Amino acid sequence: MIIPWQGLAPDTLDNLIESFVLREGTDYGEHERSLEQKVADVKLQLQSGEAVLVWSELHETVNIMPKKQFRE
């Protein structure tokens, strides 16, 4: 189920994004990016609709994923 990120308190959203970024450990290439930069990137993806915040009832977890990969 998609959770509207706009309905979350700003601190809650930031904490969810930070947790996601720390879990993912994505390789950013030759130049490492700060945690703040990674969080800002994910927030922009949510704002643009490119990414969605998803609640998994099966696993009782929240995740962030590309919208095109989400299936209800």
UniProtKB/Swiss-Prot annotation:
Q: Name the domain of life.
A: Bacteria
The family database entries (Pfam families) matched by this protein are listed as: UPF0270
Q: What's the family?
A: Belongs to the UPF0270 family.
Do you know which NCBIfam families this protein is assigned to? PRK04966.1 (NF003438)
Name of the featured protein: UPF0270 protein YheU
Lineage of producing organism? Bacteria, Pseudomonadati, Pseudomonadota, Gammaproteobacteria, Enterobacterales
